[in-house]
């Protein structure tokens, strides 16, 4: 009988845990933060919802390491730790868009983060800049493919001019 690799099983359970999350509201000790940058060694610099507070480091717990990833702009639920001087909290939950929606409905989502969540801002930019693809530089590693649509457009224009 073939047994799956322990890390694969662990990853499956973590993903299942995140998908079946009941969107439990944060406790009084926990706070919502946004990732500013990744510092390596499972440490991430985060900013809080209060603008006057300084950025600080949070650590990724062992259960998430090598299984879950966070990037700049992601939201986290962190819990403070006592023993750290520079590292002041540990990640307790990686927040998804569904968490953001639920927390906003509950009225606990911070105002500072409500203005432009990265995913919604990106969706708005896609709606506003429909010609975004025109700004891209062409890929010189592939042969240029001429589309038939352009030929049809020029054919219809020339036939309109003839009438």
Curated annotation (Swiss-Prot):
The keyword RNA-binding applies. GO terms for cellular component: nucleus. Residues 106-163 are annotated as: Disordered. Residues 126-136, 146-163 have a biased composition (Acidic residues). Residues 18-96 form the S1-like domain. One of its GO terms (molecular function) is translation initiation factor activity. Keywords: RNA-binding. It comes from the Eukaryota. This is Probable RNA-binding protein EIF1AD. It comes from Drosophila pseudoobscura pseudoobscura (Fruit fly).
């Amino acid at each position: 009988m073939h047994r799956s690799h322990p890390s694969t099983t662990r990853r499956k359970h973590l993903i299942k845990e995140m998908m079946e999350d009941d969107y439990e509201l944060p406790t009084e000790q926990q706070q919502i933060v946004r990732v500013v940058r990744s510092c390596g060694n499972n440490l991430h610099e985060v900013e809080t919802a209060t603008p006057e507070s300084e950025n600080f480091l949070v650590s990724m717990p062992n259960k998430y390491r090598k299984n879950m990833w966070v990037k700049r702009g992601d939201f986290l639920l962190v819990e403070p730790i006592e023993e750290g001087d520079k590292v002041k909290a540990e990640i307790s939950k990686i927040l998804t868009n569904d968490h953001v929606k639920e927390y906003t409905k509950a009225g606990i989502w911070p105002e500072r983060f409500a203005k432009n969540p990265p995913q919604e801002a990106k969706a708005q930019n896609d709606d506003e800049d429909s010609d975004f693809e025109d700004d891209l530089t062409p890929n010189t590693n592939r042969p240029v493919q001429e589309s038939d649509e352009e030929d049809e457009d020029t054919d219809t224009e020339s036939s309109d001019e003839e009438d």
